[in-house]
Regions:
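Acidic/histidine-rich catalytic neighborhood of metal-dependent amide-processing enzymes
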Residues: 5-10, 21-22, 27-115, 125-144
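Proline/glycine-enriched tight loop/beta-turn segments at coil->beta junctions
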Residues: 15-20
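Active-site-adjacent substrate-binding region
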Residues: 104-207
Length: 207
């Protein structure tokens, strides 16, 4: 990459462990509610949930908000070595504000702990969709690309490109509502709790 600048943001909540859980969303589609606003809203809500409810977390949490595709490429150009070493689960948040089926796009291997954690949550729902990495189309492409290969799966309600309002003026505030966003937040809350609260001390005393 050439020297230059790009507007973006990241936030880190340091935990007891350097091992990280990463959440990513994007800002680059003007005026679209589900395809654009819902992901960053959920990202912010997850950050607030952690700050308000955990005095100390076991894992470190990283939140990334960049323009889609080129933003994640730029971010990875700077941090990929550190992320490869420390991230053990990652989630891309996209199109999470409508009331359609809960959906996920698997990582390239389809067998990471992120895949298993997200799949465990959405299969509890009456209607859900699980897409292969072959159906990728958001920042999971970059984070899971060969040479990077982070353990990332994407969480959606309607998958991008598969709802009729996608990339039209109909993707507006009539399509999303607070209840749908809260329902999506609950999925992520449950994942966080399974990771951060599902840790138990073990004794090392012999005999």
């Amino acid at each position: 990459l050439k020297k230059g600048y790009m507007n973006g943001a990241h936030a880190i909540i340091k935990g007891k462990s350097k091992k990280e859980i990463l959440f990513s969303s994007y800002v680059c589609h003007p005026s679209m509610a589900n395809n654009e606003l819902s992901g960053p809203i959920l990202l912010n809500a997850v950050l607030k949930y952690l700050k308000d409810n955990f005095k100390h977390t076991h894992y470190t949490y990283r939140f990334i908000l960049m323009p889609e595709t080129i933003g994640s490429i730029a971010y990875l150009s700077k941090y990929h070595k550190y992320l490869k070493k420390n991230v053990f689960a990652a989630f891309n948040l996209s199109c999470v504000g409508d009331g359609k089926n809960y959906s996920m796009i698997e990582s390239r291997s389809a067998n990471t702990i992120a895949d298993k954690a997200l799949k465990c949550q959405i299969i509890k729902k009456k209607k859900y969709n699980i897409y292969s990495f072959l159906n990728r189309g958001s920042d999971e492409r970059q984070y899971c690309s060969p040479g990077i290969d982070l353990p990332m799966s994407t969480f959606c309600r309607s998958k991008f490109g598969e709802f009729r309002e996608y990339h039209t003026s109909l993707d507006n505030l009539k399509l999303v509502n607070e209840k749908n966003l809260k329902d999506s937040l609950n999925i992520i809350k449950n994942i966080i709790q399974s990771f951060d609260l599902g840790i138990y001390p073990t004794t090392k005393v012999k005999c």
